[in-house]
Amino acid sequence: MKSTISLLLVVICTVVLAAQQSQAKKGCQAYGHVCYGGHGKRSLSPGSGSGTGVGGGMGEAASGGQEPDYVRPNGLLPMMAPNEQVPLEGDFNDYPARQVLYKIMKSWFNRPRRPASRLGELDYPLANSAELNGVN
């Protein structure tokens, strides 16, 4: 009985590992982006025909001199063109939205703190309330 259960577990584990390996071999092509090394490498030349084939006009320009937006087949996430490189991360000053947010946060944190104007009307007693109210 124990040998049958252990044999069944080994078979199940083998099937699961084989399924994972078959999914892993799809590589980057399953996600529609360029792989650098390994299997599933997309060719950088548009005429080779070994790409994933998102559209027939990958190298063609759209109307208005702009290249078309490259979208995954499911339409959820944009992907890069075959000859496009990852844009470099810009400097902090290149992001005006960050600058605006930084200025707002800085003004909030650098705002002078004023003491409560009505210390005598507080709902709770202070430890040194006599000193704060000027009573000796």
UniProtKB/Swiss-Prot annotation:
Signal peptide from the UniProt entry: 1-24
Q: Which UniProt keywords apply?
A: Amidation, Disulfide bond, Hormone, Neuropeptide, Secreted, Signal
Does the record bear Disulfide bond in its keywords? yes
Q: Where in the cell is it found?
A: Secreted
Read off the InterPro entries from this record: CCHa1/2 (IPR037729)
Q: Which GO terms describe its cellular component?
A: extracellular space
Region (Disordered), start-end ranges: 42-78
State what induces this protein: Repressed in larvae by starvation for 18 hours with levels recovering when larvae are refed with yeast or glucose.
An example GO BP is: neuropeptide signaling pathway
Where does the protein principally reside? secreted
The chain residues annotated with the modification Histidine amide are H39
Q: Please list the residue ranges that the record marks as compositionally biased, kind Gly residues.
A: 48-59
What is seen without this gene? Answer: Reduced food intake in adults and larvae, reduced locomotor activity, delayed development with mutants taking 200 hours to develop from egg to pupa compared to 130 hours for wild-type flies, reduced levels of the insulin-like peptides Ilp2 and Ilp3, and reduced wing size. Reduced levels of insulin-like peptide Ilp5 and reduced body weight of mid-third instar larvae.
Q: Which cysteines are joined by disulfide bonds?
A: C28-C35
Propiece residues: 43-136
The tissues where this chain's protein is expressed are given as: Expressed in endocrine cells of the larval midgut (at protein level). Also expressed in endocrine cells of the midgut of adult males and females (at protein level). In the midgut, expression occurs mainly in the anterior region (at protein level). In the larval central nervous system, expressed in about 40 neurons in the brain hemispheres and ventral nerve cord (at protein level). Highly expressed in larval and adult gut with low levels in larval and adult brain. Very little expression in the larval fat body.
Q: Recorded GO terms, molecular function? A: neuropeptide hormone activity
Function in brief:
Ligand for the CCHamide-2 receptor CCHa2-R. In one study, shown to be an orexigenic peptide which induces appetite and stimulates food intake, leading to the release of insulin-like peptides which stimulate growth. In another study, shown to be a nutrient-sensitive peptide derived from peripheral tissues which controls growth by directly regulating the production and release of insulin-like peptides.
**What is the protein name for this chain?**
Neuropeptide CCHamide-2
Q: Which organism is it from?
A: Drosophila melanogaster (Fruit fly)
